[in-house]
Structure formats: structure tokens, C-alpha cells
């Protein structure tokens, strides 16, 4: 999907997500619980800096902003960022497609957390592991990558969700398979929690 898709979706995005979440249907079954789980990790530690990749309308990032965190928010949709700016007027916003390259403005910066919610699955499968590794230099010591997404422990779990979702399933997305990522990134520590039949939250960092 390109930026124009999300520009056109921006006005109705939050309502569409809410409807899918409330119905416990694909693709956003468990959405609020995903956000709550990620927020619980972040808000349990002292205030610092967060990089939110694919921030969208800023629904999650605004929780951290309101709690005093310094937010750097990246998205490729200007219309989405307009909504995020309303929620976080003093945050730092960068318009860019992180799947192609991180903004140069981030060079040399480090964060307690790098967060991605419902964005990582836009990366092609062959790029996902390398992308995660490319984020490591941006983490402070003991920093974590937090991913909430349509994602699965195994390929079999994905196939079950696909069957359950029927015609609604989108075959053009690249929903992460945790088992495969762990095999490709043996030096990283993965913790994950299954939130719904089509959502997990991952917490990723260097093994110590």
C-alpha cells in the first residue's frame, strides 16, 4: 500500500479500526488490547524517548506524549500525520516511508523504545529480519523494539486465521511469523504475547 491509500483512509481510519476491534474480527481483533499491552511496557519505566514508526493518527503515541515522553513520529501519510499533530502538537514529526529508509534526521539518535503498531507487516518477508537488525543502533542500552501487529507464532497459526477470516483476508500483506524471525535473528531475545486470533505483541532486544 502506498501513502495515497492511507491519505484517503485517514478520515475514517480510527472508526474502521474501532468497528473491527469491537467485533473481534480480522484485521483489528484485539487492537485495544494490543495498544494497552505496549503502553504497559512503556509506562512502567521512567520517561524518555520513543520512536514510533508508522504512527498513523497517533492513537498510541499520544498516550506516551501525554505522559511526558519525547516522541519522534514517522509516517508516509501526510493526512494521517495531520491527525497525529492534533493529538501531539509538540511532538517531532517526520514524513517518510520507513520501509524504504529511515529519515536521515534520526541518525545518531537513541531511544528507550522503538514502537510499531500495525505497520511492520507492510515490509516484505525477506526484508523483515534485516529491518529489525537495522533498528538496533537506535536503541539505548537495554532498549526494546515493541511490535503490535497482525502476526503469528507459526505459519500454521497464520493459516488458521486466514481460514477463519474468509474473504476478508488480505493476501497482499506480509504478516510476521515469530518462529521465522527468531531463527533468522538468533542473537536477539524475543518475548511475545498472543492477544487475539490475529494479533500478537512482540518485545525484542539484544540477548544479555
Question: Where are the regions that the model predicts?
Answer:
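Class I (Rossmann-like) S-adenosyl-L-methionine-dependent methyltransferase catalytic domain
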Residues: 1-42, 57-105, 146-208
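Conserved class I S-adenosyl-L-methionine
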Residues: 46-56
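A conserved beta-strand element that flanks and buttresses the S-adenosyl-L-methionine
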Residues: 115
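A short glycine-rich, Lys/Arg-flanked "PGG" loop and its adjoining helix->strand segment in the class I
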Residues: 129-141
Amino acid at each position: 500500500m502506498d501513502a495515497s491509500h492511507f491519505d484517503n483512509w485517514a478520515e475514517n481510519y480510527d472508526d474502521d479500526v474501532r468497528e473491527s476491534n469491537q467485533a473481534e474480527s480480522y484485521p483489528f481483533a484485539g487492537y485495544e488490547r494490543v495498544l494497552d499491552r505496549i503502553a504497559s511496557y512503556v509506562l512502567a519505566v521512567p520517561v524518555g524517548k520513543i520512536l514510533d514508526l508508522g504512527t498513523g493518527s497517533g492513537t498510541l503515541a499520544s498516550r506516551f506524549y501525554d505522559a511526558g515522553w519525547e516522541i519522534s513520529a514517522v509516517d508516509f501519510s501526510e493526512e494521517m500525520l495531520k491527525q497525529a499533530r492534533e493529538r501531539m502538537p509538540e511532538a517531532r514529526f517526520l514524513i517518510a516511508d520507513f520501509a524504504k529508509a529511515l529519515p536521515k534526521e534520526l541518525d545518531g539518535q537513541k531511544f528507550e523504545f522503538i514502537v510499531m503498531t500495525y505497520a511492520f507487516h507492510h515490509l516484505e518477508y525477506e526484508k523483515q529480519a534485516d529491518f529489525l537488525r537495522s533498528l538496533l543502533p537506535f536503541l539505548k542500552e537495554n532498549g526494546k523494539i515493541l511490535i503490535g501487529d497482525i502476526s503469528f507464532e507459526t505459519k500454521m497459526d497464520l493459516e488458521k486465521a486466514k481460514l477463519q477470516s474468509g474473504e476478508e483476508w488480505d493476501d497482499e500483506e506480509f504478516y510476521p511469523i515469530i518462529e521465522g524471525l527468531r531463527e533468522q535473528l538468533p542473537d536477539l531475545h524475543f518475548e511475545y504475547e498472543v492477544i487475539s486470533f490475529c494479533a500478537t505483541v512482540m518485545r525484542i532486544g539484544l540477548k544479555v
